[in-house]
Regions:
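Regulatory extensions appended to serine/threonine kinase catalytic cores
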Residues: 286-390
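Eukaryotic protein kinase
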Residues: 1-313
Length: 391
């Protein structure tokens, strides 16, 4: 985790910022904590995007839909202000490294991993697939298609995987960096896109099933089933659309399932219900990850608890807010077994005092009026969170 800079706000909404955990096409992501101790990840939209009405409309719609996703397999959207001068959204902060960092490299949202573990054992991949399928079911039930399911958007915890950045990244779909609307724009990561995404066709939940197949092949082997982009992204996308996947090294027990997910025809791919039947695993008594990874996750949790509050925020800026969009979300129903162990998390209240914006920060120079936030109180809570990846 990086320290806050003098240009960063020290509070957003009801949350005090602790540090930077990354940045992406949509904006900066911060680790934050409420006055009652709940840790969240807050994504603050880039200023130039906040000025585009088309983006704001899509962002508002996607956040509203994403708030309806209730699953123990996702990092839930907890709070948001889509009407602020600079919109933001807060999600659960998941205590675990990304699948990408675990399998092939030390890069994690907070940069604390000392190295990669390598490909996961077959049983771990089997349970990973089950958890991800549960997450996709919840996302699809809310009327969303993730469209960017990839290893950096999957976080590993002691009691199962968590999917992050569902739905919200779609707000960038028709908005380019220059503010020009672009039709048929590609959304996704080249190595983990579906053929219909590559061709610019309409995407459906079957798109996420294809991406799931690519993710499981990667988790099993440490390699992408359609090769890397070393020869160019266009060559890689051609292979996705036209060639068979390379499943060398995938355990025999997973080859057929992954092959079915990677069918070119969306209609020929299994549904999430069919996948759950094939991924059913009654052996849940033992930890789902190897011992070395379990130990690493424990260290991550300790580091999160040891996080200290930053310096006094009184002399630093705060991201301006207007009308908070924080309608409570009904308690979700946890997934059917195998499901992770979850714990209820308490609702947090808005602070009684928030510092005024500092001159020169680049936001409107107006007094800050604290908003009354109604925080959801889900009936579950993923392990106290640790770092979403970013679209």
């Amino acid at each position: 985790m990086q320290s806050l800079t003098p240009q960063d706000p020290r509070a957003i909404g009801a949350y005090r910022l602790l540090g930077r955990v990354g940045a992406g096409g949509m904006g900066q992501v911060y680790l934050a904590r409420s006055d009652r101790g709940r840790t969240v990840a807050i994504k603050l939209v880039r200023g130039e995007l906040a000025e585009q009405q088309e983006f704001r409309d899509r962002f508002r719609h996607e956040v509203r839909a994403a708030r309806q996703v209730g699953s123990a397999w996702t990092a839930p959207v907890l709070d948001a202000d889509t009407e602020a001068a600079v919109p933001w959204v807060a999600t659960g902060y998941v205590a675990g490294p990304s699948l990408q960092a675990t399998v092939t490299g030390p890069r994690t949202p907070v940069g604390v991993a000392s190295g990669a573990y390598g490909p996961l054992p077959e049983r771990s991949v089997h349970i990973l697939g089950s958890g991800l399928t549960h997450a996709l079911q919840a996302i699809h039930s809310a009327g969303l298609v993730h469209r960017d399911l990839k290893p950096s958007n999957i976080l590993l915890t002691i009691d199962g995987p968590r999917v992050i950045d569902f739905g919200i990244a779609r707000a960038l779909h028709t908005v380019s960096d220059g503010g020009v609307t672009r039709t048929g724009a590609l959304v996704g990561s080249p190595g983990f896109m579906s053929p219909e995404q590559v061709r610019g066709e309409r995407v459906t939940p079957a798109c996420d099933v294809f991406c799931l197949g690519s993710v499981l092949a990667y988790a099993s082997t440490g390699r992408l089933p359609f090769g890397t982009s070393d020869s160019g992204a266009h060559a890689q996308m051609f292979r996705i659309a036209q060639e068979d996947p390379d499943l060398t090294g995938v355990p025999v027990g997973l080859v057929e399932l992954i092959s079915d997910c990677l069918r070119k025809d969306p209609a020929a791919r299994p549904t999430t219900d069919e996948l759950l039947e094939r991924l059913a695993d009654s052996d849940t008594a033992e930890p789902w990850l190897p011992g070395a990874l379990i130990a690493q996750l424990g260290r991550h949790a300790v580091e999160l608890l040891d996080s200290e509050d930053p310096e006094d925020p009184e002399d630093y800026p705060i991201a301006p807010a207007q009308t908070a969009q924080t309608a409570p979300v009904p308690d979700p129903t946890p997934p059917t077994p195998p499901s992770p162990t979850t714990a209820a998390t308490a609702a947090t209240a808005a602070p009684t005092h928030v510092p005024a914006p500092a001159p020169g920060y680049g936001y409107p120079q107006q007094p800050y009026q604290p908003q009354q936030h109604q925080h959801q109180q889900p009936g579950f809570g993923p392990t106290p969170p640790y770092g979403p990846a970013y679209p």
